[in-house]
Amino acid sequence: MSAPPQVLPPRQRILLTAHDLFYRDGVRATGIDRIISESGVAKVTFYRHFPSKNELIEAFLAYRHEQWLSWFSQSLAQYVEQFGDILPALVPCLEEWFSDPHYRGCAFINTAVELADMLPESLDIARRHKQQMAEEIARYLPLGPEREQRAEMLAMLIDGAIVKVQIEQQPQNALLLLREMLNSLAKVWGDQ
């Protein structure tokens, strides 16, 4: 990876470098010295902005949350408008992400698995991220007592597809299975 442009402020260069490395290589596998080297900052500058690796990890997750949720909201809105319903919109929305050559699963699932014992805060951050993803999904579901539960069901299906694509290293099978499950849900929910 090339270092971020030097025109960016040091904190942003550090964060963007950490984002790319943490997402691609994992949080534990990425050392501070590598981030310092690839972001083109001095060690003193790094520690002025991020006194600990844990603080950088939390900043990475906050940044990733903002970026991913913004993309998800926009993409989902586009496909819901195109298809008129959330269920058929989810597959093409996720296909966009899964087809990205840099796809490496969900940064929140990955980080929670890597750091649950070492950084329990990562679990709280992951839970908040997943809750906000479910809330975004709920926006497109009919009002009613089942709305929240249905949003959670869809979020769980999405998480399963995310992990399946990450393990299989290709999205076609996961997207096919997700489409079948969503079609089944549409029939069940339509009968109620």
Language-model-derived ranges and their functions:
Residues 98-124:
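Amphipathic alpha-helical segments used for helix-helix packing
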Residues 66-69, 75, 85-88, 117-142, ...:
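Amphipathic alpha-helical packing segments from all-alpha helical-bundle domains
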Residues 1-9, 190-192:
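N-terminal intrinsically disordered/low-complexity leader segments
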Residues 79, 115, 165-169:
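Secondary-structure edge/capping motif, primarily at the C-terminal ends of alpha-helices
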Residues 57-64, 71:
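Alpha-helical DNA-contacting segments of helix-turn-helix folds
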Residues 121-128, 143-192:
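Hydrophobic/aromatic-rich alpha-helical bundle segments in the mid-to-C-terminal region
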Residues 59, 73-100, 151-154:
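Hydrophobic alpha-helical connector segments
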Residues 13, 17, 21-55, 59:
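Helix-turn-helix
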